[in-house]
């Protein structure tokens, strides 16, 4: 593993000593390969968790590990690149760095909307519209976890909901979910996960 990467991960443990951060860092160190779906997923999750804990600079540094990787046809790998781009986009939007926001969005669009032939692009656009209308939410899963009193499971589903909302926010908004509503929903999930971060174990 690159020395700078190792230093970054060690710095994260100092800033965020909670078990979930130690777990993600251990996963990254165990098999540090950008061709590994598991490594990429752990990097994406670590980036999102850092944003949740208001560690924006560290989140950007983690995102920078993979945000320049090109799409090679494996969506299981690239969905994690997409994930860190959405975190970057939100941070840059808060800072008023609009050109960087545009770059993040274009990178996502080039793969999710405009990659492949016309038939694939049509399918991609249909899926995109469903996502932007909230059809990818995890509200039922969250409710079931609440009803069963399973806090750890609720945190997990809320984390996935949080990442879904970040994607929608990075891609703009829709009639059903304008920017103001998305920002409010993102903040709600962010606060809940941060409050219960010691119980997170996914």
At which residue positions do the language-model features occur?
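TPR/TPR-like (Sel1-like) alpha-helical repeat modules
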Residues: 102-114, 166, 180-194
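"A position-specific structural signal for the A-helix of alpha-solenoid helical repeats
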Residues: 6, 10, 45, 80-87, ...
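Helix-turn-helix repeat elements of alpha-solenoid scaffolds
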Residues: 12-26, 52-65, 99-106, 131-139, ...
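N-terminal alpha-helical interaction modules that lie
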Residues: 1-41, 45-46, 51, 149, ...
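Flexible helix-coil transition and linker loops at the boundaries of alpha-helical arrays
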Residues: 29-37, 68-78, 113-120, 146-152
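Short coil/turn linking the two alpha-helices of tandem helical-hairpin repeats
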Residues: 74, 96, 116, 130, ...
């Amino acid at each position: 593993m690159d020395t700078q990467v190792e230093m970054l991960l060690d710095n994260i443990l100092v800033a965020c000593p909670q078990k979930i951060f130690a777990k993600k860092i251990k996963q990254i160190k165990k098999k540090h390969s950008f061709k590994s779906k598991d490594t990429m997923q752990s990097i994406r999750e670590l980036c999102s968790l850092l944003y949740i804990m208001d560690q924006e600079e560290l989140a950007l540094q983690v995102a920078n590990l993979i945000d320049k990787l090109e799409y090679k046809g494996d969506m299981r790998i690239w969905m994690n690149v997409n994930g860190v781009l959405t975190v970057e986009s939100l941070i840059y939007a808060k800072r008023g760095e609009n050109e960087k926001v545009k770059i993040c969005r274009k990178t996502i669009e080039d793969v999710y909307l405009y990659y492949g032939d016309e038939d694939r692009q049509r399918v991609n656009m249909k899926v995109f519209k469903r996502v932007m209308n909230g059809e990818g939410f995890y509200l039922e899963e969250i409710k079931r976890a609440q009803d069963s009193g399973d806090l750890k499971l609720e945190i997990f589903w809320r984390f996935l909901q949080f990442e879904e909302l970040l994607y929608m926010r990075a891609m703009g908004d829709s009639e059903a979910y304008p920017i103001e509503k998305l920002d409010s929903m993102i903040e709600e999930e962010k606060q809940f996960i941060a409050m219960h971060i010691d119980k997170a174990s996914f």
